Amino acid sequence: MQCALYDAGRCRSCQWITQPIPEQLSAKTADLKNLLADFPVEEWCAPVSGPEQGFRNKAKMVVSGSVEKPLLGMLHRDGTPEDLCDCPLYPASFAPVFAALKPFIARAGLTPYNVARKRGELKYILLTESQSDGGMMLRFVLRSETKLAQLRKALPWLQEQLPQLKVITVNIQPVHMAIMEGETEIYLTEQQALAERFNDVPLWVRPQSFFQTNPAVASQLYATARDWVRQLPVKHMWDLFCGVGGFGLHCATPDMQLTGIEIAPEAIACAKQSAAELGLTRLQFQALDSTQFATAQGEVPELVLVNPPRRGIGKPLCDYLSTMAPRFIIYSSCNAQTMAKDVRELPGYRIERVQLFDMFPHTAHYEVLTLLVKQ
């Protein structure tokens, strides 16, 4: 992938950009095989990749510069701002949004937050696009509600310029730290969730719910999990750390009992909405801590699917699964190091199948799906 920002030394986020994709995949596969070298793996499936540019459905832009000439992008370690509107990871549909946002920031008087001086209001712009209908969700992350009335007043102009903006919110993040969002979310549109669709499964994205940033590869990840589950004799499963329900909604059948657990209430609201649309009455989604939920149960289903954050599922949940011994565990991981550590804590299981998903091209990161079977 050619990137003018990288070539000019202005951005180094894509550290592997000079390597062709096949070389990147080989290096990631070698890393994964090295991490799982102590475990016999019955089947290594071919890695899955997607487009090498324009694949991201989300932009997280630090706002800097002045109210008249805002910059959308990032800050270097020395505090120097860098405009990343031309980043080739973003689809072409993002360019007109960025172009309209710059004059809008001036119209609404949203002074960019100055980190060094701890002054200003507008900290971040967060943009998400739906692959199914091109609808977008835009979030303004502000330090306080001081400029909220001004923003509301100027908003009709922006909506006229960008009718694709279906959900618009203000998030209040008052702390002087590099934290992307605060707890308070103020909706400026009637619509509160963005409609998405993977493999004919309706999914919903709300402002404070996690959603994969590479839809082309994520949809293949969910479809693969569905195919693996359909090959197993499973009538009851848990989907732990379930997010908006992507895995569970793909894997569920009308006669399957499924419980999805996720700590974020916003994500659970999305999952429930999807389940209702699909008419799946035996699906239950709850906003709870996944480890606390599981370890409080006296019995387990035939299959437990886990999709934890980078830290992994951790020893307490590993110990519980080892003791309760569900017949199958499907582990989806964005950090193969912690997954390998967790698998070591599950000595009663063998690895039946592993597949790498190149969710993050041009970086060392990748997603991996692993099927563990009780010995």
Swiss-Prot record:
It comes from the Bacteria. It catalyses: uridine(747) in 23S rRNA + S-adenosyl-L-methionine = 5-methyluridine(747) in 23S rRNA + S-adenosyl-L-homocysteine + H(+). Pfam families: tRNA_U5-meth_tr. InterPro entries: 23SrRNA_MeTrfase_RlmC, MeTrfase_TrmA_AS, MeTrfase_TrmA_CS, SAM-dependent_MTases_sf, U5_MeTrfase_fam. [4Fe-4S] cluster binds at residues 3, 11, 14, 87. GO terms for biological process: rRNA base methylation. PROSITE patterns: SAM_MT_RNA_M5U (PS51687), TRMA_1 (PS01230), TRMA_2 (PS01231). The keyword Nucleus does not apply. The active site is at residue 334. Belongs to the class I-like SAM-binding methyltransferase superfamily. RNA M5U methyltransferase family. RlmC subfamily. NCBIfam families: meth_trns_rumB. HAMAP family: 23SrRNA_methyltr_RlmC. This is 23S rRNA (uracil(747)-C(5))-methyltransferase RlmC. It comes from Escherichia coli O9:H4 (strain HS). The gene is rlmC.
